[in-house]
Amino acid sequence: MTNRIPHIFSAVLILLVACSRPEQAPQVISVIPQPAFIQQSEGVFSIDRKTSIFVEAGDSSVIRSVAFLNDRLLKAAGYSLPVVADDPLRHAGEKGIFVLDAGLKAEAYHLVVEEGRVVLEHGGGAGAFYGVQTLLQLLPVEIFSEKRVRGIHWELPCCDIEDSPRFAYRGMHLDCCLHFFSIDFLKKYIDVMALHKVNRFHWHLTEDQGWRLEIKKYPLLTEKGQWRKETVIGSLSSGFYDGTPYGGYYSQEEVRDLVKYAAERYVTIIPEIELPGHALAAIACYPELSCGLEDHYETATKWGIFKQVYCPKEETFKFLEDVFDEVFELFPSELVHVGGDECPKASWKKCPHCQALIKKLGLKDEFELQSWFIQRMEKYINSKGHQIIGWDEILQGGLAPNAKVMSWLGEEGGIKAAQQHHEVVMAPYPKYYLDYWQADPDSEPLAMGGPTTLRTMYEYNPVPEVLSAEESKYIIGVEGCVWTEYMPTPARVEYMAWPRMCAIAESGWTKAGKDWGAFTRRLETHLGRLDRMDVGYCKAFYDPFIELHKDTQYSKIATISVDAPDAEIHYTLDGSTPTVQSPIYTGPFVVNRQQRVSAVAIRNGKTIGNIRYKDF
């Protein structure tokens, strides 16, 4: 179909649509990620039991996409809308939501809301799905409730939205090795991703601390490799262990179910099988994969980098090829992640086989041996119709010909790869690392470092300025990374990931210039959606963040900020509780020894967050 349909509809509506409602203030539109173009007008479209959804016959992917709207309506409103698969022109005079194939790009959509109808144009199932996600965000936040909500008018503000993504790859990562998470939680994780138009789930499945994927040819990987005998308590340096065996793995049946679930939400799952480092759990099961320099190997019980890595010998390559053969049966993704990071070379330096191989191949050193290792695996993976992506370190010793780079060590690796005309996903720490503190460490749970605040993540530009226009084309996307050393529960994952992932999602989708103030206003509404989805996000958005900067031996300079829009910060210096009568923060000030800075955010005369303090 072509764009003739909306024009015909417009002509018909001149006759059929009348202003039957009194004028009213337009609802504020708060969509995350921000659409490329949005224009709001007066009026609303009301959804009720008489509303129908009209789709073109035979388009099963679009029918599945609009089913997500009905699923939400059934839970929150108590009813769903009839879906009419027919020629929409035959129903031009009826009240409804018209979902039309207008030949747009795959993920693009065009949404027009008028008082008499809604038209959602797309170029296929993905565009229709993303249009539905935006449509849901135009409705009252109660649409995300799991139980029926009474007394709500299910109204869409009249508007015109044209939208398409900035990047093809919009990713979110989850490490399920350092801590294990159930399939039910992963489905919820994917649901929240999909709401934000995030379309890649990078699933970290193998590590030193546990192997999480069933491989039928190598049953010990899950019979033994899933387990570690105990886990370090607290930080890496604590020296204390809990003495409790820890394990968990995903059966192939569970994986297939999750892959299907994700695909229905236009999320592609990219599995990560680490090589040649971070392999201790596998080596503990099959010691012949190592260089054989130790008498005993066991799955790691603490975090960090371990010297036990895969030995580049035929037994190892046969093992890895067998593993990937089963991986390819489970994951239809063209991309597979091969890790490639943090591979110590100590074993290879001592290993007679490795040294002989370096000499035989005419390699310069162990770094080039790692490059050869990865290139050999890339050839096999390419032969099976797949492509590899790996962390920055795959650049060391020479980049495999067809490899994509996931830049995590700052921007340098991404810049270098893009300049070599290799595609890059930007996932730099600390900018996109969600295991870092997001607020004052004094009031936050244990984390890897930081802080990396919501604002820092929002304002980061994932396309480095040093790249030329041509080189910038090789930046294909972004990813937020969730490493779970200090996230033992689903609740902690949600707390660390959201709402910061909202900022990363917007950087991945939205092309336009950034506006922090506008983002926070949209986000405040959006948090109501996350509340109703039972997402346990961090509420530091409402809390003052106090920082003390060096001044003199006897004084420091205090700065205070808060993310919540239109909030005043009130503070005290004498240890008393700040109230609306306390001084308003207007800029940096001097703090002397033995003073306590206490601060709270207040809006419209009411406290909106927690009181925070900092002692000097």
Model-found features: residue ranges?
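Feature activates predominantly on carbohydrate-active enzymes
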Residues: 104-335, 376, 380, 479-483
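Short, compositionally stereotyped local motifs that mark structural "simplifiers"
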Residues: 31, 54, 63, 520-616
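Contiguous, structured surface segment used for ligand recognition
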Residues: 20-167, 492, 507-520, 524-533
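Bacterial Sec-dependent N-terminal signal peptides
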Residues: 1-29
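Flexible, acidic glycine-rich loops studded with aromatic residues
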Residues: 388-393, 398-403, 409-557
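Active-site-proximal loop/turn and secondary-structure-junction residues that shape catalytic pockets
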Residues: 205-209, 217, 273-279, 342-344, ...
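Active-site neighborhood of glycoside hydrolase catalytic domains
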Residues: 282-288, 299-301, 305-401, 408-416
